[in-house]
């Protein structure tokens, strides 16, 4: 098993799609039962979120990955992303997410938010 930490979302920085996640958007998010997917594909569940919390930078995630192939991708510096439902947003120059329902966390090759990355890996 491999464990990793990283940021699935970065606050107050526009992503490549023109979305901005604001502090507090994940205030109701819980780790319990949140899957880790490969490239947002529900058929490729590779682990589970152990803990998540908002800090000054964004949504910090710690997760366990059981998929042996995922360890190499993690160590290569995988990007992170998240699946969500919008609960509250403001539209303007950017779409600003004020409240989101977290569905999943994904390891991705090209994250919409380039700063959303795995920052530490331990284990196999």
Regions found by a protein language model. Give the residues of each.
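Short conserved beta-strand and strand-loop elements enriched in small hydrophobics
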Residues: 33-42, 80-81
């Amino acid at each position: 098993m491999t464990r990793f930490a990283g940021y699935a979302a970065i606050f107050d920085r526009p992503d490549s799609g023109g979305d901005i996640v604001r502090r507090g958007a994940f205030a109701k998010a819980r780790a319990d039962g949140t899957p880790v997917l490969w490239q947002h594909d529900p058929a490729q569940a590779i682990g589970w979120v152990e803990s998540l919390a908002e800090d000054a930078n964004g949504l910090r995630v710690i997760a366990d990955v059981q998929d042996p192939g995922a360890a190499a991708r993690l160590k290569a510096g995988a990007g992170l992303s998240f699946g969500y439902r919008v609960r509250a947003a403001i539209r303007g120059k950017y779409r600003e997410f004020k409240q989101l329902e977290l569905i999943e966390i994904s390891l991705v090759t090209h994250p919409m938010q380039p700063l959303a990355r795995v920052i530490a890996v331990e284990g196999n």
